[in-house]
Amino acid sequence: MATGAEQTGGGFPVDPLHQFVVQPLIPLNIGGLDASFTNASLWMVVTVVAIGLFMTLGMRSGAMVPGRMQSVVESFYTFIANMVRDNAGHDAMRFFPFIFSLFMFIFFANMIGMFPYAFTVTSHIVVTFALAIVVFLGVTLTGFVLHGPRFLKVFVPSGVPMALLPLVVAIEIISYFSRPISHSVRLFANMLAGHIMLKVFAGFVLTFMTMGVVGWAGMILPLFMIVALTALEFLVAALQAYVFTILTCMYLHDALHPGH
């Protein structure tokens, strides 16, 4: 989210990329490895704490007739539980705690990143790729543990003519191992692009403000665009958490039911 007017060398009042700079807050070097506690680390901790507070405050009463806060928490639970059942099957509910945690982390990280001076951790490919590779390795390991070598049937779609089978298998293998890339880039690129657009239009507003009366009239359009884009970004933040999670459910379905 736009965090102020950082002057760039080219004269544009706002640097759209400044908001993504990872800065060490507590420098730490272990055996030549930079393990500093950064602003990204801080906002990941804030995200986890916010989720913990949200769940604790929402469910502390445990009333049979839920209040507003408890209803919100239960709606998250129901929504994600239905997502798992519909896309991965009822037997996938054993993995519900992981999928629920994954959705909540991405959702809260995206939403927190929309506020001024916050850091959007999901706008960094290293974070989204770490999440995607955990999903990929977990799904693959689950497939082999449950099915052994039969899990390899995931690369052999049913009903494919023998003449096309080698080509189709090759395509399926490439597609499978590219999952972490597409899974992570989708989230990273959407969050990055949206925040850059917000910062660019904020720069236009600041530029027009320095032009006197004419500039104040000219800033109406970019100011309107900021409001519209902010609303759109909140929608995208929620949607990307949903997309990342539903893809995880679909990948899990492949592990539980290979060859289907």
Curated annotation (Swiss-Prot):
Subcellular compartments: Cell inner membrane
GO molecular function, one term: proton-transporting ATP synthase activity, rotational mechanism
Membrane topology reported for the UniProt record: Multi-pass membrane protein
InterPro entries: ATP_synth_F0_asu, ATP_synth_F0_asu_AS, ATP_synth_F0_asu_bact/mt, F0_ATP_A_sf
Presence of keyword Signal: no
Pfam family, one: ATP-synt_A
Coiled coil: none
Keywords: ATP synthesis, Cell inner membrane, Cell membrane, CF(0), Hydrogen ion transport, Ion transport, Membrane, Transmembrane, Transmembrane helix, Transport
TM region positions: 37-57, 95-115, 125-145, 154-174, 191-211, 233-253
GO CC, alphabetical: plasma membrane; proton-transporting ATP synthase complex
Function: Key component of the proton channel; it plays a direct role in the translocation of protons across the membrane.
Subunit-level organization: F-type ATPases have 2 components, CF(1) - the catalytic core - and CF(0) - the membrane proton channel. CF(1) has five subunits: alpha(3), beta(3), gamma(1), delta(1), epsilon(1). CF(0) has three main subunits: a(1), b(2) and c(9-12). The alpha and beta chains form an alternating ring which encloses part of the gamma chain. CF(1) is attached to CF(0) by a central stalk formed by the gamma and epsilon chains, while a peripheral stalk is formed by the delta and b chains.
Similarity remark: Belongs to the ATPase A chain family.
Protein name: ATP synthase subunit a
Native species: Parvibaculum lavamentivorans (strain DS-1 / DSM 13023 / NCIMB 13966)
Classification lineage: Bacteria, Pseudomonadati, Pseudomonadota, Alphaproteobacteria, Hyphomicrobiales
